[in-house]
Curated annotation (Swiss-Prot):
Localization of this protein: Plastid, Chloroplast thylakoid membrane
Organism: Pyrenomonas salina
Transmembrane segments: 17-37, 58-78, 117-137, 143-163, 170-190, 251-271, 293-313, 350-370, 372-392
Protein name (record): Protein translocase subunit SecY
Cellular component GO terms held in the UniProt record: chloroplast thylakoid membrane
Sorted UniProt keywords: Chloroplast, Membrane, Plastid, Protein transport, Thylakoid, Translocation, Transmembrane, Transmembrane helix, Transport
Top-level taxon: Eukaryota
SUBUNIT field: Component of the plastid Sec protein translocase complex, which is composed of at least SecY and SecE.
Function of the protein: The central subunit of the protein translocation channel SecYE. Consists of two halves formed by TMs 1-5 and 6-10. These two domains form a lateral gate at the front which open onto the bilayer between TMs 2 and 7, and are clamped together by SecE at the back. The channel is closed by both a pore ring composed of hydrophobic SecY resides and a short helix (helix 2A) on the extracellular side of the membrane which forms a plug.
Amino acid sequence: MESIRRNSRKEGIKERIFLTIGLLVLSRLGTFIPVPGVDHDAFYQSISTNPIVTFLNIFSGGGFASIGIFALGIVPYINASIVIQLATTSIPNLEKLQKEEGEAGRQKISQITRYRALGWAAIQSLGVSFWVRPYVFNWDSQFVVQMTLALTTGSMLIMWFSEQITEKGIGNGPSLLIFINIIAGLPKLIQQKSNAISSTNQTTELVVLASISVYDSRIFIRDRRYYILQTVGRHCKQTSYLPLRLNQGGVMPIIFASAILVLPAYLGQVIQNQFVLKLVTLLSPNSSDKNLYLIFYFSLILFFSYFYASLIINPNDVSQNLKKMESSIPGVRPGKATTDYLQKTLNRLTFLGALFLAFIAVVPSIIENITSISTFKGLGATSLLILVGVAIDTSRQIQTYLISRNYENIMK
């Protein structure tokens, strides 16, 4: 800690930290700026016990319940990112932009993602403007336009905040924004739990919550260790190592899966159809029968773990790079055999990591169903995993940045 404090005084790291903190504070302030024309007291009382709104508030830090200008949060941008990243694996032009055109191609993909996020934010904002109609003082076309513009603009600001944090700050912007929104709800949760300690069952609830929190943290740290694969150079005969992580995607599969589960909730609030509402209730983490939700959530985490691993590591590219460096894996022929070996190894690691991640995400809900102890009301395992994962990723990025700065100073 002393070395971190000493190094943080160096030029660069302080600016990044201050920028990150400043943008996170601004993102929180926006949730308290209400959209005009809505009876916010009546609206809050009406939806305060709505489990779907409670789920949506995870991503907006309470902004959805108060209909602040940042009510949509980072969800439109995450949804757009999911669509574009899926498209890069199936649309040749996008795949070419990502792999062959370098930084210019990635910037074009980022621009496409922004436009898609803008469109999705406008659609969601329009839907919310119709949803709050019973609580609006003077609902007309002018109000619909004003609210759509306000929520869309707020979502675009959040998107810009996230990009600035990623590029010029510390950590992953979208992850940190979700992180700070979850943290914002902790004081209220702690107060509720403190006031509730009056019986053995309630004390047991806190013990289980603390135990699962520690359990989540330990498992999540363990599954992020590196898997070492030995390589040998042909001429110099030096031994080096190719690191493969058990969980390539980190916390992103959890965030992506949660973002997908938010979509039916949005539709359920806008489309007042009995079938849609029933489907939304079944896919809600607060539903009475969580079996369908748990199966769907488990499957989404598995899918996005494999999907994210395929984006981060391409076995064919790694094989070609090893061949160019005149290196090989002992006992494996260069070329296609190396590619197949890497793909097989990556699939096994991803499968184990995805199972760990999905299991830790759903086991608290299973325990809650069995014991009938509502341990995770307000702070589910998903939130715990996101908190732990983002904290680990951010601290690791700070350490990497400090090491690179020290190396640059030595070279100078």
